[in-house]
Amino acid sequence: NGQIESEENYKDNVRDGERTTWYYSGEIKSKENYNNGKLDGKRTTWHKNGQIESEENYKDNVRDGEKTTWYFNGQIKSEQNYKDGKKEGKSTKWNKNGQIESEGIYKDNRIDGKRTTWYSTGQIKSEETYKDNKREGRRARWYLNGQIDYEENYKKGKLDGKRVFWKRNGQIKSEDNYKDGKKI
């Protein structure tokens, strides 16, 4: 149909400068910068409806800095920071209605710290803590009505201590004890 698919710059036969791509229908698809053949700087993508889809930064062809994504309806979907291509710092995700779904902390691409999830109503769903990508300490989950579902403890990624399950009405369903991942 004669529609331009992409426009890019080259220097000595190597991609250098801004590159723009379009959907077949003519809407802009992406815009990114290159330095001597490598992604460098801001990269932006769009949904077919013209809404922004993602924004991220690159340094020497490696993701570095904040990455933000959006749903087709324009609502923010996620925010995550990167350092040298690895997740670093707070990671947050939202549902299509703008309600927070999850939040956690990453260190060197591994979950490290508190991680929380929520139901679409805003009610807390679960809470747990990680140390170097392994569960550590208390882990709990709640029913949608706010009543606790279960609570358990971890040490170096293994169940350790008391684990309790509750019914939706608050009555205890079962209790177990664990040591080093084994039921005692």
Feature names for model-found ranges:
Residues 1-184:
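Glycine/tyrosine- and acidic-biased, solvent-exposed loop/turn segments at the edges of beta-strands
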